[in-house]
From Swiss-Prot:
It comes from Burkholderia multivorans (strain ATCC 17616 / 249). Keywords: Amino-acid biosynthesis, ATP-binding, Kinase, Nucleotide-binding, Threonine biosynthesis, Transferase. The gene is thrB. Coiled coil: none annotated. This is Homoserine kinase. Its EC number is 2.7.1.39. One of its GO terms (biological process) is threonine biosynthetic process.
Length: 332
């Protein structure tokens, strides 16, 4: 969440006329991230997030905002889009679609432990099941077709070894995506970007017996319909790794995956292709980070991510991937 489009006080005052949210108390840009312009907005009626969508179109946006509303209605803690005075969930600001959503309670946990991974695993499975009857369909826009389109633009900037890995893994994933087993994998709406900084935790009540309480998932603007296992792989590749080496932390990975299975057990096809999907999840973010690093857009507040992080993860997943952990029936 960077700031590509600046919003002045007069811009904000004009925009807020379309909302019944009271008077503005505070407003500031959010510097992290790379896709949209985001701002914390505090009014006399509560705390919110204003997002200006830099790439998503008005035709694409209903998928994301309606998905958040659908999930919230099924008990999944996500930001709730705030309707404007005309009932619409978004409008136009500086010629771009923009929306206001409620701000979740809690803070990101950037050094998660087993207890955090358990909470994330269970809620991710609940989210997947809650999305099964969501009527809108839109593919993950950062999947295989996007890789195939953008890798050629990246390869002039990278080393020979990196080019070999980019092109070799792309061929591997194209074969996997074209297989009968891939077609048989279950799926539906996925977050597709459930990193540590897109999940909030709040203090658990003393009488719950839990050390932490999940506050919610947010930043659904990379969401799309995909295989659920891809969403799990993306999550594990961030929540359950040594950040310096990319090596999986077995304790955290097992905790997240076992917790997920208490809600939705994995299929035989998913178990066979866990390695392929972990590689796909790493490849997706390596490609996008390379693209943003070498072909950046202008932004007022932009902190590009290190592409080497996901290169290390991809190489590690190719070399070593444990099987999905089993779970006893009694734990279901």
């Amino acid at each position: 969440m960077a700031v590509f489009t600046a919003v002045s006080d007069s811009d904000l005052a004009q925009w807020m006329r379309h909302y019944a949210l009271g008077d503005v108390v505070a407003f500031r840009g959010i510097p992290s991230g790379i896709e949209n312009s985001n701002f914390f907005l505090t009014t006399t009626r509560g705390e919110y997030v204003l997002t200006i969508f830099e790439k998503l179109t008005a035709e694409q946006l209903p998928f994301y905002l309606d998905l958040m509303r659908h999930l919230a209605g099924h008990g999944v803690p996500v930001p709730d889009p705030v309707p404007r005075d005309d009932g619409a969930l978004f409008g136009t600001l500086h010629g771009k679609p923009a929306a206001i959503v409620t701000k979740l309670d809690g803070a990101a946990e950037l050094a998660p432990g087993v207890e955090h991974c358990i909470e994330v695993g269970q809620m991710l499975a609940r989210m997947h099941l809650a999305g099964r009857d969501y009527p809108r369909r839109q593919p993950n826009l950062r999947s295989l077709p996007w890789w195939q389109e953008n890798v050629p633009a990246i390869v002039p900037f990278v080393t020979d070894a990196q080019r070999a890995l980019l092109e070799g893994e792309l061929a591997h994933q194209a074969r996997f995506f074209g297989s009968e087993d891939y077609a048989a994998l279950p799926g539906g709406p996925c977050h597709c970007d459930l990193f540590r900084d897109n999940v909030l935790f709040a203090h658990a009540a003393p009488d719950t017996g839990h050390a932490v309480r999940l506050g919610g998932f947010f930043d659904f603007y990379f969401a799309g319909c995909d295989k659920w296992l891809f969403d799990v792989a993306v999550t594990v590749n961030d929540w359950c790794v040594d950040l310096a080496t990319g090596v999986l932390d077995t304790a955290r990975a097992d905790a997240l995956l076992r917790a997920y299975q208490t809600v939705r057990p994995f299929t035989a096809e998913e178990r066979r292709h866990w390695s392929d999907m972990l590689r796909a999840g790493a490849y997706r973010f390596w490609v996008s980070r390379l693209y943003d690093f070498y072909l950046p857009r202008a932004a007022e507040m932009l902190k590009p991510h290190d592409p080497g992080h996901f290169e290390r993860i991809l190489r590690e997943r190719i070399a070593h991937t444990p099987a999905l952990p089993e779970i006893q029936t009694a734990c279901n």
